[in-house]
């Protein structure tokens, strides 16, 4: 159980997944390349390490150094590298011109793990539009409102007031 994973999250979700669901997830590749785009969940090396930021001993999220970010991209020739995991929308341009983008989260605007807390301040779905231009990749981060009521009701029904609050407000108090 990696230190930044919420065991309650797994406990809530696992009973809802059939063996077929779990098999499908296990069969997914750790990374994927589509043309000039490289995709991974967290970093190219593993599924739980944050690529663009880290959690300080005090529980704050801080940016990783550019050399650390770039070292994780070594050997990847694609010009656009997509990652996630942190639920924080951000982009970093590497010294060689490649761009790393985390689009944010569509359905989890915050969470409180054992080691840190993430809040976005709004319940909106977040994603990124990406266009390849003559001068490189153009990124437009989007923040879109949606009806969170069904997810909030489900969180409350599952006795997760923390999830209900963050889904409804984008905040954890």
Segments from the language model and where they lie:
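Active-site environment of divalent metal-dependent phosphoester hydrolases
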Residues: 45-47, 80-94, 108-112
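Metal-dependent catalytic neighborhoods of phosphoester/phosphodiester hydrolases
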Residues: 1-3, 92-95
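Short active-site oxyanion
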Residues: 77-80, 138
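Active-site neighborhood of divalent metal-dependent phosphoester bond hydrolases
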Residues: 1-35, 45-46, 51-77
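Acidic, His/Gly-rich catalytic cores of divalent-metal-dependent hydrolytic chemistry
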Residues: 93-173
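Divalent metal-coordination and catalytic microenvironments
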Residues: 25, 41, 85, 104, ...
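Short solvent-exposed loop/turn micro-motifs enriched in small/polar/acidic residues
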Residues: 23-27, 84-85, 121-123
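Active-site-proximal beta-strand elements of phosphoester/diester hydrolases
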Residues: 36-43, 100-104
């Amino acid at each position: 159980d990696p230190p930044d994973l919420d065991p309650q999250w797994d406990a809530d979700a696992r009973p809802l997944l059939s063996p077929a669901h779990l098999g499908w997830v296990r069969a997914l590749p750790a990374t994927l390349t589509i043309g000039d785009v490289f995709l991974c969940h967290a970093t190219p090396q593993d599924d739980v390490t944050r690529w663009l930021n880290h959690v300080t001993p005090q529980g704050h999220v801080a940016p990783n150094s550019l050399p650390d970010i770039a070292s994780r991209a070594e050997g990847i020739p694609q010009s656009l590298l997509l990652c996630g995991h942190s639920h924080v929308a951000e982009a970093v341009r590497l010294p060689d011109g490649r761009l790393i983008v985390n689009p944010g989260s569509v359905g989890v605007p915050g969470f409180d793990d054992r080691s840190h807390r993430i809040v976005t301040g709004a319940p909106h779905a977040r994603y990124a539009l990406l266009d390849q231009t003559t001068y490189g990749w153009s990124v437009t981060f989007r923040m879109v409102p949606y009806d969170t009521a069904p997810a909030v009701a489900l969180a409350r029904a599952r006795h997760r007031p923390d999830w209900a609050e963050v889904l409804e407000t984008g905040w954890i108090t």
